[in-house]
């Protein structure tokens, strides 16, 4: 906290001799069920633009958000990273694309990627805490919504063609993309394509920590950290006085190495040779979205949606003792629903209904879970009202979840009903500040993995055992925040407490599997429950002012969360505290961004299988410049650097943090052309 105090003092001193510029953009938050924009929302939320995403090169979704207050990442290599919000991850965080849940198998294994392409997006919306219930598919911990304009809700005015090229030094990575949008005789058309190829990424000396008793030649790169991606998406829509209607199709194919699948015995390597674990994914997603303006006595408007996803991931052994063995993970899902606008006068009211069917299967050599059939039905009511100096938001949702599968040859048909609600108050203290209180009670049904996992999971070197008798998690939340923007400084201070009954987590038993499964002698880990509490805070201050011929912006922030069980022990792999500093300068067609993230050491470990993690500093730099060329709307060159200090860095939240550190220093260049 001393660093924050010092920085505030520095900002205060600067403010005595500069001219401030307060011009923060207002953005529509598409995932807001109540249809709010950023000036109307006081919930803990981040909005990240496409420009901000492109400043630092291509990363996984988790790593792209890792420098945001209250948001971290758990990773399994360069392109495999899942977001962590206020210490919660996995099924407690929902990843959405245009408001619809992303239906892949990233929840089954830490080595599985989130199947979302960040090419040609408009923005990413991150909602933290219980207020996420007021947004599309709100979850116990928060949501991440990736927004693009594949299905345009407004007529496109002009044709736009974009080209992009990127190169990264840390893995000799090359990225190419081309995007087109146009209106052809009243039909809005969107096309986007990306191809990426990354070799093994470089790591600092002595970055890999091997298991006790295992030695290996140190290398300057991480084996099997390569990846290839090909993604395209297309959509069409029509917009009329009555509303809009659109369809879209998306395909993503990945081929990537798994950088850790357990340490191999030297005698086995001598006999069978080196082994490579390679995964390939193929997904097709078809969406329908639309809106119809009824203007009736009860219903004003209906927004509707339908989504069909066909996803597969094949994990194959190439070389070594298990050469040719494969495991196929599949997920087929359908989801549909509607949002009914029944607002009256100054009272915003919405009713949301959803239905989802999902079939998840694992076939092959490492089929550690039986096929699971899931059905989910939900209905929710949402209200927003302005009462004097108060703004009130309320949401309540009823969920019914059914899962069918087998566990130890016993068939299970599990029904789980839950009710969640959130109540938010915003009091306007004066023209530049407000105080917000959010109270929430949210429930979460156990996931398929938590219920039915039962087998060897080599990626995490565990024999994982689920429990069909797990109860629903019940979370009670208090979130208090103060926001201000007085044309000199702006900032937010958040304090929160999250009491979770029946918190589900995986714990090592200290025993090993000796039943002859492959791989052999894996540590046994059970999914169990215990009451838990997460307490934390998020502080961020900023200012921007005229400087030289442009505008200079400074922000400082800190986030911290502690997670403990009712018996006083620690929740495993909890996010360490962080200090985040950013400096940005813009002048006409020039932009410069410097980001420094100081990640504190984490010594509050959570029992067997968890270990302390050293702190580190990540320094990132980005410089962008646009040039005027004849016949070109914009030609922009971006120079960027990641981990400029070449620090040994590892995410404490990762199950393979020792064997799979973060990449070393990366220097990159990108070109963006808009016609």
Regions inferred by a protein language model and the residue ranges of each:
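Periplasmic-side early beta-strands and strand-to-turn transitions of outer-membrane beta-barrels
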Residues: 157-162, 175, 179-279
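Short acidic/polar hinge/loop motifs at secondary-structure boundaries
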Residues: 101-130
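Extracytoplasmic beta-strand/coil segments of soluble accessory domains associated
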Residues: 62-104
């Amino acid at each position: 906290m001393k660093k924050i105090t010092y920085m505030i003092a520095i900002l205060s001193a600067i403010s005595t001799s500069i001219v401030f510029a307060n011009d923060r953009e207002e953005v529509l938050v598409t995932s807001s069920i109540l249809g709010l924009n950023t000036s109307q929302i006081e919930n803990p939320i981040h909005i990240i633009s496409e420009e901000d995403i492109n400043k630092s090169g291509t990363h996984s979704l988790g790593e792209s958000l890792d420098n945001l207050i209250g948001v971290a990442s758990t990773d399994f290599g360069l392109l495999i990273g899942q977001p962590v919000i206020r210490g919660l991850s996995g099924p407690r965080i929902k990843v959405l694309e245009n408001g619809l849940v992303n239906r892949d198998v990233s929840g089954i294994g830490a080595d599985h990627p989130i199947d979302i392409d960040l090419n040609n997006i408009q923005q990413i919306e991150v909602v933290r805490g219980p207020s996420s219930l007021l947004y599309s598919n709100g979850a116990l911990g928060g949501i991440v919504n990736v927004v693009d304009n594949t299905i345009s809700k407004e007529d496109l005015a002009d044709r736009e063609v974009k080209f992009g090229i990127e190169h990264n030094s840390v893995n000799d990575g090359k990225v190419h993309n081309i995007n087109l949008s146009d209106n052809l005789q009243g039909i809005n058309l969107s096309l986007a394509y990306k191809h990426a190829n990354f070799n093994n990424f470089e790591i600092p000396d002595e970055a890999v920590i091997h298991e006790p008793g295992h030695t290996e030649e140190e290398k300057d790169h991480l084996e099997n950290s390569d990846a290839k991606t090909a993604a395209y998406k297309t959509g069409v829509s029509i917009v009329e006085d009555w509303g809009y209607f659109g369809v879209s199709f998306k395909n993503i194919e990945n081929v990537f190495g798994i950088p850790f699948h357990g340490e191999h015995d030297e005698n086995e390597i001598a006999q069978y040779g080196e082994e490579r674990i390679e995964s390939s994914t193929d997904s097709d997603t078809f969406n329908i979205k639309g809106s119809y303006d009824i203007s009736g006595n009860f219903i004003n408007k209906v927004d509707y949606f339908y989504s069909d996803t066909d996803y597969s991931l094949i994990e194959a052994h190439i070389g070594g003792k298990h050469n040719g063995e494969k495991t196929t993970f599949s997920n087929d899902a359908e989801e549909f629903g509607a949002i009914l606008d029944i607002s009256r006068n100054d009272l915003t009211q919405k009713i949301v209904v959803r239905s989802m069917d999902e079939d998840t299967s694992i076939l092959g050599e490492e089929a550690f879970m039986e096929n699971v059939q899931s059905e989910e039905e939900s209905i929710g009511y949402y209200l927003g009202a302005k009462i004097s100096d108060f703004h009130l938001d309320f949401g309540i949702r009823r969920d019914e979840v059914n899962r069918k599968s087998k566990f130890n040859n016993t068939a299970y048909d599990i029904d789980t009903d839950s009710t969640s609600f959130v109540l938010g108050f915003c009091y306007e203290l004066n023209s530049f500040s407000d105080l917000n209180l959010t109270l929430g009670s949210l429930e979460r049904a156990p996931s398929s993995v938590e219920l039915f996992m039962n087998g060897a999971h080599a990626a995490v070197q565990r024999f994982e055992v689920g429990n069909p008798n797990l109860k629903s998690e019940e979370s009670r939340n208090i979130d208090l925040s103060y926001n201000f923007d007085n044309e000199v400084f702006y900032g937010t201070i958040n304090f929160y407490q999250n009491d979770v009954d029946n918190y589900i987590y995986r714990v090592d038993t200290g025993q090993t599997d000796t039943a002859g499964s492959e791989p052999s002698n894996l540590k046994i880990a059970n999914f169990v429950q215990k009451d838990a509490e997460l307490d934390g805070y998020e502080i961020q201050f900023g200012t921007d002012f005229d400087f030289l011929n442009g505008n200079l912006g400074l922000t400082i922030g800190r986030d911290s969360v502690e997670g403990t069980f009712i018996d006083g022990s620690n929740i495993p792999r909890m996010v360490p505290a962080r200090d985040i500093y950013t400096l940005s300068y813009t002048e006409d067609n020039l932009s410069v961004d410097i980001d420094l993230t100081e990640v504190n050491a984490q010594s509050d470990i959570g029992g067997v299988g968890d270990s302390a993690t050293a702190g580190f500093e990540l320094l990132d730099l980005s410089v962008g410049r646009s040039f005027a060329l004849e016949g070109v709307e914009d030609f922009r060159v971006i120079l960027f650097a990641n981990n400029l200090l070449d620090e040994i860095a590892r995410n404490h939240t990762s199950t393979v943090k020792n064997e799979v550190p973060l990449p070393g220093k990366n220097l990159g260049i990108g070109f963006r052309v808009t016609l």
